[in-house]
Amino acid sequence: MHLPRSIAHPALVFARVAASHYVLIGISAGLGLLIISGGVHLLLGSFASAAAAIGVIAAVPPDQPAPRRGKLRQLLPAVVVGLPLFFGVQWIGDDALLLGLLIVPASFLAFLGAAWGKRGIPLSVSAMFAIIFSIAVPGHAEGVSALKTTMYFALGMGLYVVYATISNIVLNARYRTLMLADTLLSIAALMRTQAAQFTLQEAAATDDADVVVSPVGRLIREQAALADQLQAARDILLESPRTPSRQRLAGMLIQTLEMRDHLLASELDVEALVNHTSHQPVLVALRRTLEQLAREVERLADSLIAGRKPVPFASHRPALTKLAWAAEEATMVGPSPAILARGLADRVGHLDDETLRLIAVARGDQPPNLANVRATWQMFVSPTSWSWRPMKSLWRWDAPPLRHALRAAMAIATGYAISLALPWGTHPYWVLLTITVVLRGSFAQTIERRNSRVFGTLLGSLLAGGLI
């Protein structure tokens, strides 16, 4: 989960996270697990309920907010991959050698799912959950056959696929609003970062260590986060924009794309102007204006999350027209700094116009630009079908998904061997589960994930202890 950079109060940041689509989909998944496991327990008993709960857990990772029409395609691959893996582990039983010969190559193939990017990673996790939690099932101790245990597992997966598809339809309207709000928060963070570039020397004199260390790196990171956020929002908001509320949200998303384009276009002008001291007063004024616009965009996002009508603000255009420009340099070749500064001010003015228009559309004071929505919605939506083309490009040593899959398979093999060699009694799946949820494509991401897992485990233990 990407948290946009903000200077908001921690309580407000917490409220945004608590109301986000990440928490909403988590609540939906938890409710589905409770309903399915509880229902199976009442009808078939505790062992069937435990196996069905594992099926639900294995089906959960691909369950993300998605267009209604593509939801089933998003979930079914986890069932197709997870069922044979679960049965294979159950069929092998307690034979440690055969089990190792299954889980190591299966882990390699599962982690190759990263070839499909953000769509494939949840499928990889789902496959690994099917393997790991199948090891944890005490099937033989209960006197239940491998096939019957797998049937309970399949029951849980199947019921959750149905539940998640229905839940996605029910929550679709809320997902649209929250995805747009998250996109607005991301673009507000990018506006703040871009504003900091206007007076980089002034920023370096402050205590903002992030600006001093790597302003360009942070800018690139937030641009990448915004691109991911925009694509996820496009897929949901631009699906069947037929009702007035959907058209309003889709129109606002298209305007957000235009704001992103204005921000990207201003980067070159900022780089050329930041070292011209004669234009520093203008750049300081533009920075303040852009930061004020970022606050207005954040307020708009908060209003969408809370279901309130956003409050309009006064245009900054009059203040921009009163800026005092430095004199032109006659000896300059090409565009002078004064011309670049005026162009930059004009782009900030366009951002002001788009922000005003966004709020007007959100309030219902102005209709969305339906012509833009109709012209672009099919072009921006990602395909929902699966293709084998990413797999064909994997088989070379410099392919990151292939190298990640090899690292993962070696880590799983090492962890499994260590768990068997430990002198005290242990459960091998504990080690394998830790590797699966922590290992990422780079060492830095793995360390970050490890720290998050340690903190999450500690927090969960405290909460569980408090409940007990």
Could you describe each region identified by the protein language model?
Residues 1-38, 42, 141-145, 163-413, ...:
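Cytosolic regulatory and coupling regions of membrane transport/channel systems
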Residues 397, 449-450:
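Hydrophobic alpha-helical transmembrane segments corresponding to the first two to three helices
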Residues 87, 99, 243-247:
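N-terminal loops that bind phosphate or other acidic moieties
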Residues 2-11, 26-71, 75-86, 100-165, ...:
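Pore- and pathway-forming membrane helices of multi-pass small-molecule/ion transporters and channels
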